[in-house]
């Protein structure tokens, strides 16, 4: 009698491998430990994934798909271009706040594999940055068309916003205790987008100018 198919094996291996790759990097991860964590032998891991590299890229693909889905869901909440921009940033930051190991996995790809492997990388570490910036540019262009955003150069603004969001995540990972007070995706996304909302600079100038409400005598 043939052995029943374990339909949860790949999910368990992805989860176990995520923990190991995030904690120990590519070189430090041992397939037998991944298997033990997932409840199978080392041979069981290789039965599903032909190599450690194949397992690693399965992990990368899993988290990339999840991240892009989170950004798309955030941007797809409706409203103006400004609302979509804030939603996209909120989705991206929220994903990394909920899944810190995913960010570490992408850093392993950038730090170890791009320099050390000659095998074709189906999508290099820069691809995720490009996809994120492209999504932000779409929102910025829409905000310019519907009048909800005033950013000047959408490409430059997307680059700055993506860099700011990435910087937030880097600080979360490097100094979680110190950055703990600044882990709200909602607050961060709002703070990043507000300066580009139409009328913000005018409102800010009016609030800061002590003579704004002064009416000169006739």
Regions found by a protein language model. Give the residues of each.
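Amphipathic alpha-helical segments used for helix-helix packing
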Residues: 97-122, 170-174
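Amphipathic alpha-helical packing segments from all-alpha helical-bundle domains
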Residues: 65-68, 117-146, 155-159, 187
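Hydrophobic alpha-helical connector segments
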Residues: 58, 72-102, 157-161, 186-189, ...
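Helix-turn-helix
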Residues: 9-12, 16, 20-54, 58
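C-terminal peripheral helix-coil segments that are non-catalytic and often amphipathic
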Residues: 91-95, 130-145, 164-218
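Short linear capping/connector segments at secondary-structure termini
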Residues: 72-73, 107-113, 175-178, 211-213
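Short coil/turn segments at alpha/beta junctions that flank glycine-rich nucleotide-binding fingerprints
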Residues: 23-27, 78, 99, 146-147
């Amino acid at each position: 009698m043939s052995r029943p198919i374990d339909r949860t094996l790949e999910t368990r291996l992805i989860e176990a491998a995520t923990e190991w790759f995030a904690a120990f990097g590519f070189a430090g991860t041992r397939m037998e430990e991944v298997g033990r964590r997932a409840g199978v032998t080392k041979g069981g891991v290789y039965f599903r994934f032909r190599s450690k590299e194949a397992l690693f890229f399965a992990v990368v693909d899993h988290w990339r798909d999840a991240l892009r889905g989170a950004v798309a869901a955030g941007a797809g909440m409706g409203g103006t271009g400004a609302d979509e921009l804030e939603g996209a940033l909120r989705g991206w930051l929220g994903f990394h706040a909920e899944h810190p190991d995913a960010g570490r996995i992408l850093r392993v790809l950038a730090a170890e594999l791009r320099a050390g492997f000659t095998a074709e990388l189906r999508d290099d570490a820069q691809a995720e940055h490009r996809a994120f910036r492209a999504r932000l540019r779409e929102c910025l262009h829409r905000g310019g068309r519907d009048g909800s955003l005033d950013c000047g150069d959408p490409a430059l603004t997307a680059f700055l916003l993506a860099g700011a969001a990435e910087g937030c995540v880097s600080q979360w990972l490097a100094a979680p205790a110190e950055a703990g007070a600044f882990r709200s995706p909602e607050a961060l996304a709002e703070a990043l987008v507000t300066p580009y909302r139409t009328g913000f600079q005018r409102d800010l100038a009016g609030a800061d100018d002590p003579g704004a409400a002064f009416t000169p005598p006739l």
